[in-house]
Design a protein with these regions (language model features):
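Extracellular mucin-like PTS domains
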Residues: 29-44
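...with weaker cross-activation on analogous glycine-rich loops/strands in unrelated enzymes
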Residues: 118-204
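Bacterial signal peptide processing site
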Residues: 24-26
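Bacterial N-terminal signal peptides that target proteins for export
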Residues: 1-10
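Bacterial N-terminal signal peptides
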Residues: 10-21
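Low-complexity, Gly/Ser/Thr/Pro-rich intrinsically disordered linker/tail segments
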Residues: 192, 198-259
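N-terminal capping segments
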Residues: 41, 45-124, 242-259
């Protein structure tokens, strides 16, 4: 009995370590709908990536977080979704991190003071980001230049968003906005927006779908479920195609750095 108990404790500790090391790669209950392909996978993947790259290249924004995130994407040669320790080699275009690692590196490169303000000098967790963003004003920037964006339709390139379920082992997810949100004409409770993130599960119209590096840094369409007041209440992981929303009972909050 003692040996069996010890084994169970070891398994539990390893499981706790795995989920606490970084963000989850996708919500717990995604409901994807896979479109039929009419061309070869390689041709389709190359065309999709080129289309996404063109969309990102056309973004007009002076936001420092956006510029930092886009620089990583545009210079990327190799990427992978991994928990710490991360590998970030800008000279060779290698980016291996999870969603938190991506957001951290983009923000540190954009404005180190704004990054350190969140964790008060320590490396922030997703919970730390959530607590910090939740306290922000939606109108007046704090000393570090941060405001909260309350409604998904008001998001802009460079805004940082996250979801998590406090008090659970679910470590949530983080992403950076890269486009202008638009309400799905077929589903009025869904704000569709292009994002950059690091994940193991691509979104819709995603640069990682069929690519050589299918996990890690990339861009796709996320759907943010909103209530009648425009507040975020859930996520459609594959924006516009997921048949149902997940993460309905979680914290979903976004912050904007204005400098």
């Amino acid at each position: 009995m003692v040996r069996r108990s010890a084994l169970l404790w070891c398994v539990l500790i390893l499981a706790l370590f795995a989920v606490s090391a970084g963000c989850m790669s996708a919500p717990a209950t995604p409901s994807p709908a896979t479109p039929a392909m009419t061309a070869s996978p390689a041709t389709t993947a190359a065309a999709a990536h080129a289309s996404v790259a063109d969309q990102l290249a056309s973004v007009k924004s002076d936001n420092l977080v956006w510029k930092s995130a886009y620089r990583m994407f545009s210079t990327m040669k190799s990427t992978e979704y991994v928990h710490p320790p991360y590998t970030v080699d800008e000279a060779n275009g290698t980016y291996k991190f999870d969603c938190l690692g991506f957001a951290d590196h983009a923000l540190m490169d954009a404005d180190m003071a704004a990054y350190t303000a969140i964790g008060k000098g320590a490396n922030p967790s997703i919970e730390t980001y959530a607590a910090y963003f939740s306290r922000l004003s939606t109108t007046t920037p704090d000393a570090a230049g941060w405001t909260k964006v309350a409604h998904p339709v008001d998001l802009a390139p460079g805004d940082i968003c996250l979801w998590l379920k406090p008090g659970t082992l679910d470590t949530g997810h983080m992403w950076i906005i890269t486009g202008t949100p638009a309400i799905n004409p077929k589903r009025s409770d869904e704000a569709l927006v292009r994002i950059l993130d690091s994940t193991g599960t691509p979104h819709s119209d995603d640069s990682r779908t069929g690519a050589a590096d299918r996990t890690g840094l990339g861009s796709g369409i996320l759907g943010m479920m909103v209530d009648s007041g425009g507040n975020p209440i859930g996520l459609y992981w594959e924006g516009g195609t997921s048949t149902g929303a997940g993460e309905k009972d979680t914290t979903i909050v976004c912050g904007r750095l204005s400098k």
